[in-house]
Amino acid sequence: MASAIAKDAASPTVGSLPPPLLGKDRAGNEVDLAALRGKVVIVTFWASWCPPCRKELPVLGHFQRVVGRDALEIVAINYKEPRRTFTDLVRQNRDIDLTWVHDARGSVSDLYGVRSLPHMFMLDREGRVAYTHNGYSEEALPGIINEVLSLLPEEVRARPASNTASR
């Protein structure tokens, strides 16, 4: 299930390099995909008014914790909400360990051609789009987990915590 929004730009396609600058994190640091090369990166666009987004974020936070930031970076980009709403939501979800970015004007969302929420882009370790997903459902979760695991190096997949993520 996904929440629709109107957009005209095309989304980055599988195999392409997406726009590198994702905005600023909560500490004010620019999140640049070039600095994350060598890791699998998930970029997900979300909003507080999107019920599937609110279901997806805790799952992604758990996955981030299980795999570890040395191999996986999950960037959650808030879509066009007031700064106060964004900061309140991040504060309420402080136990979800993601890189939180606020896209107040929707400029990053526009560059990514986001048409519905949640909208996920999964990048391989070279920074290229490997998979994309629109919406969120419990049924799709095993496939998403397997996609992430397929992009991780063997030594990360062999870790005990990573093996439990695929069960």
Where are these regions (language model features)?
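N-terminal "domain-start" segment that seeds a small globular fold
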Residues: A2-L33
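Active-site acidic short loop of glycosyltransferases
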Residues: L36-K39, R69, D95, V114
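Short pre-active-site segment immediately N-terminal to redox-active cysteine/selenocysteine motifs
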Residues: K39-V41, W46-W49, S116
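Conserved redox-active cysteine motifs that mediate thiol-disulfide chemistry
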Residues: F45-H62
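Short, internal strand/loop/helix patches
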Residues: V75, T87-E126
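Thiol-/selenol-based redox modules, centered on thioredoxin-like
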Residues: M122-R167
